[in-house]
């Protein structure tokens, strides 16, 4: 019986990790003018993530813009390496601003 309960707990942890993996890749996106600006442009949607202006959303939950808009609490930075941090919402971070 101990073996059965440990197997069922393993399978439940596997199914929960699948859902987290599915949400992990959700926010990766490329900005249309990233080539012209030498990179650092992109956007993402989600909840409570970090967005780095290298066109990669590390958590699938970006919520920032170059001016710090589009998130609660929402902080953003638009410089050559646009990046930001936010709560829920949507926005973009771009190094071209």
UniProtKB/Swiss-Prot annotation:
Residues 1-22, 62-97 are annotated as: Disordered. One of its GO terms (biological process) is sorocarp development. Pfam families: Coiled (PF05710). Residues 72-84 have a biased composition (Basic residues). Residues 85-97 have a biased composition (Gly residues). Disulfide bonds: none annotated. Transmembrane segments: none annotated. Belongs to the hssA/B family. This is HssA/B-like protein 44.
């Amino acid at each position: 019986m101990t073996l059965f309960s440990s197997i069922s707990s393993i399978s439940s942890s596997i199914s929960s990790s699948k859902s987290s993996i599915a949400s992990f890749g959700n926010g990766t996106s490329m900005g249309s003018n990233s080539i012209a600006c030498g990179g650092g442009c992109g956007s993402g949607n989600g909840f409570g993530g970090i967005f780095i202006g290298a066109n990669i959303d590390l958590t699938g939950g970006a919520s920032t813009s170059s001016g710090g808009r589009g998130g609660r609490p929402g902080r953003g930075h638009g410089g050559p390496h646009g990046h930001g941090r936010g709560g829920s919402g949507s926005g973009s971070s771009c190094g071209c601003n």
